[in-house]
Every structure is written in structure tokens, then in C-alpha cells.
Amino acid sequence: MEEDAGAASPAPEPEPEVDPARELEPEAGVSESISRLWTDVMGILDGSLGNIDDLAQQYADYYNTCFSDVCERMEELRKRRVSQDLDVEKPDASPTSLQLRSQIEESLGFCSAVSTPEVERKYPLHKSNSEDGCVGKGDWKKKNKYFWQNFRKNQKGIMRQTSKGEDVGYVASEITMSDEERIQLMMMVKEKMITIEEALARLKEYEAQHRQSSTLDPADWPDGSYPTLDGSSTCNSREQSDDETEDSVKFKRLHKLVNSTRRVRKKLIRVEEMKKPSAEGGEEHVFENSPVQDERSALYSGVHKKPFFYDGSPEKPPEDDADSLTPSPSSSSLDTWGAGRKLVKTFSKGESRGLIKPPKKMGTFFSYPEEEKAQKVSRSLTEGEMKKGLGSLSHGRTCSFGGFDLTNRSLHVGSNNSDPAGKEGDFVYKEVIKSPPAPRISLGKKVRSVKETMRKRMSKKYSSPVSEQDSGLDGMPSSPASGKPDSEHVDKPKLKAGGSVESLRSSLSGQSSMSGQTVSTTDSSTSNRESVKSEDGDDEEPPYRGPFCGRARVHTDFTPSPYDTDSLKLKKGDIIDIISKPPMGTWMGLLNNKVGTFKFIYVDVLNEEEEKPKRPTRRRKKGRPSQPKSVEDLLDRINLKEHMPTFLFNGYEDLDTFKLLEEEDLDELNIRDPEHRAVLLTAVELLQEYDSNSDQSGSQEKLLVDNQGLSGRSPRDSGCYESSENLENAKTHKPSVLSTKSSTESNLKSFTRSQPGNYPTLPLMKSGEVRKQGEEGRLGRGLAPDTAKSCDVPSVTDLSKNRRSLPVSICRSCETLEGPEPVESWPRSHSLDDLQGDADVGKNVPTEMPETCSQNVPEVPQKTSACTSKALPRGRDPTADVMLLTQSKRFSDPPKTMAKKLDGSVVASNLGIAPPQCIPRDFEAQPPVKPGLTRTSLEGLRKGHDHHPLGTKEGVDGEQSAPETRTQSRHPSQPPPVPAKKSRERLANGLHLVPSPEAPILPLKKASPASPVSPSDCPSPREPRPSSGTEPGSPACTRPPPWLAELPESTSLQEHGVKLGPVLSRKVSCVRGVDLEMLTENKLQAEGIDLTEEPYSDKHGRCGIPEALVQRYAEDLEQPERDVATNMDQIRVKLLRKQHRMAIPSGGLTEICRKPLSPGCVASMSDWLISIGLPMYTSTLSDAGFSTLSQVPSLSHSCLQEAGITEERHIRKLITAARLFKLPPSPEAM
């Protein structure tokens, strides 16, 4: 069509064409009709009716084309339409067959037709619309032109046709109506009440109706017009072109539909919104939005009135029926009158002139304006109605913008409407339009089926609203039709407006069914159907009954795009049942009976609800107070709510994380009160039991008891421990651990196995206190396991396995430990000597220990620990007992035993908890050397001791040195700050020592079953050398090795156990560890280095300590780099936790070395100094005039000395780094 149009008249030459057309056609009738058309057209042109240029401008804007192009295109369309009109008119004037008409058209060509701007315009519009989808922007421009041309042509053509085939008055009225409607459409478009596409669709519908009715042989004329519109067979025989054109037009429309779907949807949405406010104006609104309803009504009513007047009975009934039937009177009437027209066409032009007139009137697009006016006014257009109206107007072809969809629907609607109305014309129309193109018929059937489906579904949802609107429509004269149209109307709104309604409605719900609907009749109906299904289906039945993975409360309103059919509309406070939580962040859930997607950022997951289902059930089972729903609830019950901020700040927001809490975590969280620690650990155990044991009620009970004990300080029996006495004494589970080690062992094993995975979560524990507590508990457990191994294997195993479950191991009170102490002869080794003695007992196990450690690290620490504990207990019972005693003493006498505890802790740490970290350092620094190992162990122990006394601070610092500290803490039940996270990290990374002292400790204990693994294996992940060193060291330090051996096997000393092999070395390492942490911290303070600031810690708490700084500190403090790195990270973590910031322990030296620790882009002198580990000279060099990076290469020994740097090693470092320094592309002055 475009080509034809372009060929016909690239430039607007309406007049020339008009003249030939007039010459060709009976001039009188044509001139009369044309004169009327031109009057209307001129009214539009002169602005009285509206400005065509405005419309053209809008089209130009709409299609992103030049105004001139649009005008040209419109002119071309107009000319084409004129030629078509001439062709049609000729057939009309002398009723001829389609062939005759097509022949005439061919002979006449487009030029032969009288140029009726209206007719042409309409055709062009039609054409342009149909072309819109398939044509490019250029086509669109042309379309715009055609739109205007069609506008005029249609009007003129209608006049001519009417004059020819019908009374001029009728024609005039028809034309007037079309003009009015066009003006209204233009005004509506101008006012943005409707989109250009909608206007085009209406014009097309009008044209189609027009052609059908205006042509004496409606079928012929419409066919001709259709071909013309298609432009595929403009000069070809109209018959063939009609069928083919119809098909092609359909497809073009479908294509266009797809293109215009978005706009149509938007329109529909707008219309829907308009329609919602005024449901009664629906019919009129089909063409316009509610505001324009009156105008449209006037336009349509004007046209309609005329048709009614002229056709009186035939058209009116159809219109009434159509109106009532169709949500949009115009569309229904169009369909009806279109059908009538086609019927007329089908009949003979001459035969059905009376009919034709009525159909024409109806076809006059505005034939039913009067009726419609009332109807329109009475009800607001529904978007569906609007679409219908447009579709019926375009009647299958005319609607190019939503066109195809609308047309098919309108056809169906029209058919249905007319059928109910009992219109022959409708049937004929259907036949004429449908029968020629098989595809159309199939589409019609599809549309019908879709409508049926949509009606069924949507009627339920929208039955009330739609019925109201429909009632307005149905209220119209044609009630019979309205009954059916009502449902159809419902369907239509669903298909079209429904889509839009849905999209509006669902746009609220985040689902827009419209998007699919307008794409194509079938597609749109299908998508509509689907969307309706999801929406309507929800009302009918829950769309999803399957399992939910949780619930979430919406905290932020979210209204999805109307094109987003999958998203849910979220309103604050809505509770969404989560169906799936993909990692991408777009979750799926059920809300308001609609399954859709939503972004997790808009909701708060209700952990309580997710976790509660199990717990509540358990609680109910127990009949005791329900299980706590949140950490806050839990802490409230155990009267420890003062720790709530600590837990929340450190990542223990939910019970799943909280139940991973361990003693070392308590240490890190700086929760040092033994009672609090015991209660917390007991609560953790109970939570774990709830989850792991079917007898959750018992666990709950224990929890309650534990809480009671805490609050009432009354003995509590967790049920895990054999003696309530132990629980009483320790309120931690140490006594019970010893007594119930065997019983808890299995539980602990299960916990341990499940916990290793949890440890990573534990590391989340942000509070140094919590970690320390956990560590202490673990140490206690670890020591207890060691002790138990020596004396009480089952107890030890239980302790190691039940780290969490066995807060007992942390026994806060000496009594608790003492209770179990009897297990072994070591009554309470307060001093390292005692521990050493124990170690001696376990001397034989040193190698075993290291092996265990290595295995444990790789394996799940807990499991291994359990096994190891079992294995070691035989040979290490005494040592374990001593360890336990020491721990119990420490727990019972934290202050006085502090030193002893530290020693014990050191031993314990060496054995199970601290050793992991210490060992890695020692291993790395002095892997083969026993003394080195011992020293490291001792350092770690000292650190652990320091941590215990220091509290979280050291514990936190000890996160890197946490291996030692934490290990120690566990045994002494003093909290080394290394978080459980670290231990896990170690296991996961294979480097347990530095990265996660806690984790290694736990893993080692747990991994003790892997005692066969050599110490080197244990540390091997991170510091294989230390492990090896430990092995040799273990034998050398006979006493320590037993401890270590015990720990590895029972608690799987973990890497550190190997490290700590010798008790003496442990003492030394303990002392050194404690001293090293204090020394490191003091040195950092003296140098003004804040490890909590960038680049040492990023905003997420990750470690960024430069390797150069670690190396320098190792040199300055004459300590192994590994120990220094661990201590520095522990200090960093401790400080971060004190600030209630996130703290992620690093993997220690190996991790630091793995990633360049330079601040990244060195942009200033300060950055450079930080990267080389000498940040304290920033101000010194700045004062000396070295403030920019460009001056770095010029640094010299004398300059540095003059600047006041006296440390020779530092000067050498600075000069070396300055020589290696390369200026960045754009250095910035500091």
C-alpha cells in the first residue's frame, strides 16, 4: 500500500485526483457528496472542527517522522482513497460484481477515483495503520499522511458513496458524522485522551464500515478499499485482492498490532482508568476517554443519529444491539452496521440499498452516534469497549493500531452482537469479512474461543465491574444482544480493555495482561487468557498451593509496569508467601491469590514465620512456652536482652544463625560473664536440639530450664547432661558435658556434623563477646575433651562434638568443671605445669594429634573431633581431665585462675582451640622447629589468655591470632576472640590456623577422628609446615603433645593442637601469643595505625592489612609473620566488633599474601606509605616536604634521616620501596 500510495501521489495532489475521479464518476452525486465531505473537511482544516495539521503533527511525533512526511503520506493515502472511492463509487453507482469493481478500479487506477480527502484519508489511515506494524518509520510517515488523507478521503468517499448509493442526506450525515468523529478523534488525540493509533483504528473502522456501507456492493467496495488499504492489490482485481488483502491486512495488522500493542496498551490503560471512573460512559468511551466521552458521543451520536434517522429500523436495531451488546456502542454498531453493510454487500447493492443505507449509517462509523451518545454518556468507555469500538470501526482491517486484535474482536463482537440482535447484516458482514479470508475466520474463531475463556475467567473477576459497565451498555436498547455482549463485553474488556483493565488492575498487582493481548488477536487473547487465568484463577482457586519457602512482609510499595505481567503489585504491609528465592534477587511468591515475582529488596523476610513453623509445632508439642521466634525473643526469655545489640550488629539476626553460636563466638562478641555464656550456649544447644532432634520438646524444655537458670540462677537441667548438678554448677554445660559426654556425644556429633556447615554462620557472629564466650565454651569443651580424653573419653567427645550443645565445656563455674573433674586425676590444673603434666600423660599422642588436626581441618571439624575425641580419650584421658579441670578452675575462678586459665587456655588452645591459629603461625614461621611451634602455641595461648582477660578486645584482635587464642579460650573457657567463622574458614580453605582460629579449633576438635592425619595435614591447608613442625615438636614437648594429641583426637587440637604439641612450648607460645597480641596492639596504637579504617578494613569488615605491614611488625617484634598476621587480624576484628561493625576475619598470613595488600591505586603519599607498611611516617615526610607521590623516587637516606626517621630498617624499607615505586598515571598530592 505504501508503495502504491507513494506511486499514486508522493506529493499531495488531492485536487487533480479528485478531478479525474469526478470525471470518471457521476459528477453530480460525487460533487454533492464531495461538497459535503469537503465542508466537513474544510471545517477540520480551517480549525472549526479541529486541525488536521495538529493531527498530522501528532502522527509525525508519534511515528518520529517529519511533519512534511506525514502530510505527504496522508496526501498519498488520500489520493489512493480517492481512487478507491471512485472505483467503489462506480461499482456503487452501477451495482457491479466485485470483479467489475476491481476491473474498474484497475482501469481507473488510484487516479480514477475521485479524490475525496476523507475517503482517501480513511483508506490511507487504514492503510497506514495496517502498514504501521509492518512498515518502517518511513511508512509510518506515509501512514500519517495517509491518516490525514484517509481522514478527508473517508469523509469525501463516504459522501460520494452515500450520494451514489444512498441519499445524499444520508451520505452527508454519514460524512458529517465521520467528520465530527474525526474531529473528535483529533481533539481527543490532541488532548491525549486517545492515541493516534486509537484514532486511526477508529477511522479505519469507520472506513471499513464506510466502504462496506458506502459502496453499493459493500463487499466489493470494502474489498476494493481493503486492497487499497493493503496497497498490495490496489489496481488488481478487487476480489482476489480483497481476500488476499484481507489476509495480508490481517497479518499486517497483527504485525502492526505487535508494534502498536504498546501504545494501544498505554491507551487502553488510560482508557481503562477513564473507564473505571465512569463505567457508564463505556460505549462512547470506546472511541474516547471518559473526558472525551461527550464529544465522542456527540460525534458518534451525530453520525449515529443520522444513520438512525436514515436507516431507522435496520441500523438502529443493529446499533442498539451492537451498542448494548458491545461494550462500545460504536464498535458494536459498527460491527452490526458493518455486518449489515456487508449483508447489503452480499445482497446486491441495489437490493439492499435500504439496508445499505442503514448499514452505511452504521458503517458511517458515526451512524449510531446518537444512540451511542446516550450510551456513551450513560457509561464510560471501558478500555475494552474503546478497543472494541475501534476494532469494529476498523472491522478487521480498519483497526491497524490495535487494529488486528481490535478488528477481529470487533468482528467477533459485532457478529456476536449482531447475532444476538438477530442481525442478518452482522452475519453477512462476518461472512463477507471473514469468509473471504480464511485466516480471519480462524482468527475469529480463536478470538471467540479466547473470548469465551476470557469471559468465563474474567467474568468472575470482572463480572461485577464489567457487568456494571455492561449493564450500562446492555441497558442500551438491545438487551438481547447486551446479554451476550455483556459476557462478550466482559471478554472484550478482558481481551482488550480487559487486558487493559487487567493491566490496570494487574498493573496494580504487577501483572499486565494487556501486554500480550494487544500483540495479536490470538496472542493477546492467549496472553490475556493466561494473565486472566492467573488473576481470575486466583479468585476461583489459589493459583499455587505448593510448598512455600517462607513469608515476607512488604516494606515498600511497588507498582510494576503495566507491561510487566509477572511482577506483583506490592503494598506496604502485604504478606507474601514466598515460593522460591532465586539468588538473582527476584523472588517468586503468592500475593492476593496471584503468583508473581517481586524483588527481595521490597520485603522483609519473616524468619520467625519461616522457622517458627517447625519450632512452634515443637513448642506446642511440648506444651511449654512456644519456641522463641527470634533472637530477640530468645534473649528476652533468658533475660539477656542486654546482649541483643551485640548479636544483631554481628549478624545474629535470626535463630538459624544464632544456633551456630559457639564459645569462641561469645569471646569475640566480648560476652564474658560466665553465667551469660553458659545460658547462651545452653540456649544454642537447645535450639540445635530442636532442629536436629525429633524430641524438640525436650530441647525446648532445656531451653526454658536454661533460661530459668540464667534468670533465676537456679540449677538447670538441659536434659542433655546427666547431672543437673553439673548444669547447676556451670550453668554452662561443662559438668553436664563431662557427665553426659557419652549421651551428648551422639547429639553433639550430629550437631557437630551439622554445625561445621553452621560455623561459617557462626563466624557471622559479630560480637567479639559472643565469640569469646563461644570460644571459652569451646575451649572448655576442647579442654574438657582433652581432659575427657585423658580421663573421660565420652565426656571429651561429647564436649568436642557438642561444642555448642556443650556450653558445659565452657563450664563457667569451677564447680561444674570440678564435678566432671573427677573424670581425670587432674583436679584443676591452674598452672601450665598441671597442663604440662597432663600433656605428659598425653605425650604419646602428639603425632596422633597433628595428624588428627590435619585431617580435621579438611574434614568437617566436628565430626572429626568427635571421632578423634573418642580415639584419643583412651590415651589422653588424664590429660583431658587435667584440661577439663584446668578449664573448670578457670571457669570457676576466672580472676585468680586467669593466669592459670591462660596457661590452661594456652594448653587448651594448643590442644584444640588456640593451636589452630597458633600452629599455623608457628608452622609457617617455624614449621619444623618444635620450639617455634611451642613458642607460637604459647604465643597463641598468651594471646588467648590476654584475650580472656582483655575480653573481646584481645579476642577480636586474636581473630587472626585467634587460632591460639580461640583454641585456648575454648579449653580455658576464656573467650579468645577468634570467631567460629574463622575456624570454618580454615576448614573450608584448608588453612585453619590463621584464617579462622576458632574454626580450626572447632574443626580440629570435631575432626579429631581424623587423628591419623598428621599435624602437618591439619595445618597443611594453611600452614602445613607448622603442622609438621608440631609433630616433631609434639614429641619433643612430651607433655604438650599429649594435650595436643588429646585435643586433636578428641577436639582434634585442630591445626593448633599440632602446633601446641609440647605443653612447654604451649606455655611459651601462650605467653608469647598473649604478649604478642598486646605488643602488636600497643605498637599499633603507638604508631597511630587504626586497623578499623581503610584500607585495613573495608566497609564490609574484610581484612586489607598490607603484607608489608605484617612483615615489618614481624621484624620489629621478632615474631613469625603468621603469628603477627593472625594477631593483627584478631585485633582488627576485635576493634571492629567493639564499634559494632561488621568484621570478617581474614584467612591469616596466607590470605594476606594471596591478595596484594597494597591499598590498590596508590593515589597519595599516605597510600604509598600504607602499602609499604610505614604509614606512621606520613606526617613526618609531609612535614619534611615530601607530600606528593612525585617526590617518592627522590627519597634518600639523608632526606629520611633529616625528616626525623631514625629506624635504620625503616629507612632501608622506604628507600627500597621508593626505588621500586612507579608514579601512577595521575599522581595526586597527598
Curated annotation (Swiss-Prot):
For bias kind Basic and acidic residues, which ranges apply?
275-297, 485-494, 768-779, 940-956
Lineage at the top is: Eukaryota, Metazoa, Chordata, Craniata, Vertebrata
Q: Which GO terms describe its cellular component?
A: cytoplasm; membrane; protein-containing complex
The entry's function note states: Is a positive regulator of NF-kappa-B signaling downstream of TLR4 activation. It acts as a scaffold molecule to assemble a molecular complex that includes TRAF6, MAP3K7, CHUK and IKBKB, thereby facilitating NF-kappa-B signaling activation. Regulates TRAF6 and MAP3K7 ubiquitination. Involved in the regulation of cell mobility. Regulates lipolysaccharide (LPS)-induced endothelial cell migration. Is involved in the regulation of skin pigmentation through the control of melanocyte migration in the epidermis.
What is the protein's name according to its record? SAM and SH3 domain-containing protein 1
Residues covered by the SAM domain: 626-690, 1160-1224
Task: Summarize subunit and interaction data from the UniProt record for this chain.
Answer: Interacts with GNAS. Interacts with IQGAP1. Interacts with TRAF6 (via C-terminus); the interaction is LPS-dependent. Interacts with MAP3K7, CHUK and IKBKB.
Q: Which domain of life does the UniProt lineage start with?
A: Eukaryota
Q: Where is this region: Disordered?
A: 1-30, 211-249, 275-337, 439-566, 610-633, 705-792, 818-875, 915-1045
What species was this sequence derived from?
A: Mus musculus
